[in-house]
Amino acid sequence: MAANSKTAIRLSLRAGERIFINGAVLRADRKVSLELLNDATFLLENHVLQPEDTTTPLRQLYFAAQMMLIEPAMREQAGATFAQMLKGMFAMFKDAEILNALKLVDELVHNGRVFEALKTIRAQYPREAELMGAQPVVWPVTKSGKSAGANP
């Protein structure tokens, strides 16, 4: 997510939790609150998709978009991969809900709002699973009672 200079963004991290900020990986050694005061691109650890979890087209698209956030040196290459994948998805998907979400994702990424695009993609995981005949992924609940996965 990009913090803008007009509004500070406050984040709370648990002990051991990681956050990716402008390509750097930080780990909290104890519960901590952070306030980002200027422009920064960040992604919380529980929103980071691992390569082995890119098992569906939308998860592969998410991974390409996430790389634009957490690997600034690869942003151009990841952006090209993302654009190519997105184009293929417009041809592959026939479902209006997913197509509308993909149009929004395209617009968000084009406007530099990659974090919001990631949220939009995650929101379509259940629909994609439904269309593929699989059960939607149910994210485990952490000890705090919050979902550890898809939607913040």
Swiss-Prot record:
Task: Please give the Pfam families that the UniProt record associates with this protein.
Answer: FlbT
Keyword Membrane in the entry? The reply is no
This one is known as Probable flagellum biosynthesis repressor protein FlbT
Domain of life of the native organism: Bacteria
What are the GO BP annotations of this UniProt entry? bacterial-type flagellum organization; mRNA catabolic process; negative regulation of bacterial-type flagellum assembly
Organism for this UniProt entry: Brucella abortus (strain 2308)
Transmembrane stretches, start-end: none
Keywords for this entry? Bacterial flagellum biogenesis, Repressor, RNA-binding
Entry's Gene Ontology molecular function annotations: mRNA 5'-UTR binding
Q: Which family does it belong to?
A: Belongs to the FlbT family.
Write out the function statement from the record: Has a post-transcriptional repressor function in flagellum biogenesis. Associates with the 5'-UTR of fljK mRNA and promotes its degradation.
